[in-house]
Amino acid sequence: IGGNEGARNCQTMLCAYMDQAGIHGDDETAKTVAAALKNDINTVTSTSMGRLFDAVSALLGVCRYNDYEGEAPIELENEAMKSEEPYPLNFEIEDDGESIIGNPLPLIYNIVEARSKGAVVCDLAMGFHMAVADFVAETCRRLRKRDDSFDQVVLSGGTFQNRILLERVVELLEADGFSVYF
């Protein structure tokens, strides 16, 4: 929502995810985003993992605005590094036999619920990182079940600049016998 500004303003992404998860805010940004989504005004579907990191960073109060590309995910990673015990979170995985899709909406809902119960921000940040890593590894496992010659994985894109995520995904995939390149 909002073109380039939407990619910078993590709060906008958060409002979009929360609206889609059925959590409706009453502040002006949430109302504007909900109306834009409902009426399909200046909205583009994003499959960017970076935008999800932006939304979670805003949700946890870590970073609400990207002054430079990747700022919110970097700050979220820094927060996660403080964790001693990751909060257990996971993606809902939708697999129809042709495509595998990670549905982050239950994850967003669970983070909101955990925050309302006093969960520690750094533990939620680390839990989010672990959930993303688990989703990537599980996707690869499912793809290999469809084609047992699938044993090499290339990790690329800005999200894999995240050291926590990269190290965990490599660890999980190598433990499952994949050759991993990054």
Question: Where are the regions that the model predicts?
Answer:
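A contiguous, well-structured pocket-lining segment that forms one wall/lid of small-molecule binding clefts
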Residues: 21-27, 31-150, 164-178
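Short beta-strands and strand-loop turn motifs
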Residues: 150-156, 181-182
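Beta-strand segments within the central parallel beta-sheet cores of soluble alpha/beta enzyme folds
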Residues: 1, 70, 152-155
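Phosphate/diphosphate-binding loops
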Residues: 1-21, 35, 182
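Glycine- and other small-residue-rich loops at beta-strand/loop junctions that grip anionic moieties
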Residues: 3, 125, 129, 158
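Glycine-rich beta-strand-to-loop/alpha-helix junction loops that act as flexible
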Residues: 49, 153-160
